[in-house]
């Protein structure tokens, strides 16, 4: 259940931070000595500002080595939505959990910077393959490098190992076959040099856990929402592959505009509350049952964390996300999902959500 739309708001920006590097690393074989930064390919995060120049310089060198390759990648290809091997959602969730843990350990300021770099890069996308400008390519890689350097190596390695466990060994060779081989190899060598600079600047200890608010109106409203909607949550097939399907009738560039609004929203979120939401999701993953449903208590905690996150963002920014998503989600999508659950449970959940929304809006800055 933690893969639903609410999670997208809570940690979607953190996932987006990694998307750029993730896709251009898909061709690499994945030796363990490359792991500290390779993990970022599937995750999120950052590093101390004191390292900005060194990592920034290294990112420019990486750009020299990899931009030709980047222009060859079809960034609009639906393959990036697919599982990197056998579809096994509960195993994949273990890898996602490691990414969330890594994200929670990251420096919130650098996460914000990385999100803003991605937003800018989306603005310079051009050409049939959907590639960003060279300057923005470098800026995104530098931002991701700083993200990774702000997380202890052990947490980065945990992501690397968990993603390796669910990735078919034939994936790297297949991805390499879609581009010019020599350009891919040159990009990979540049990546190895970049990861050495990032690892050199990596922190040894994680940041402190988030301070979680308590006794607030959003927390109380989250309990009411959870009581009203938990039966509906248990009706949902969280192990379905429907969540990997592209939105019907929409192209990748059209969908990316909505994702961009999410990134902008994420960049404006309170850093402590974002960390708290990631930690709540991590705990919720730990209590899921065989059907993918978390405990009632953890479900409530996740709802409260997301409500506080949304309240930390101006209403206009939240509405930008709502309107952009409404523009790319066909009416057949909610109708199809509604048909798969108990309608009375769905209606009760919707009523609970509307009440919760009002409390969040009243608390919004």
From Swiss-Prot:
Sequence repeat start-end pairs: 53-215, 216-365
One Gene Ontology term of the molecular function aspect: chlorophyll binding
Keyword Magnesium: no
Site (Chlorophyll a binding): residue numbering on this chain: 118, 281
Domain of life: Eukaryota
One cellular-component annotation, GO: light-harvesting complex
Location within or outside the cell: Plastid, Chloroplast
Keywords in alphabetical order: Chlorophyll, Chloroplast, Chromophore, Light-harvesting polypeptide, Plastid, Repeat, Transit peptide
Main location: plastid
Transit peptide: 1-52
Function statement: Water-soluble antenna for capture of solar energy in the blue-green range. Peridinin is an asymmetric carotenoid.
Subunit structure: Monomer.
Domain commentary: The mature protein is composed of 2 almost identical repeat units.
Protein name (Swiss-Prot/TrEMBL): Peridinin-chlorophyll a-binding protein, chloroplastic
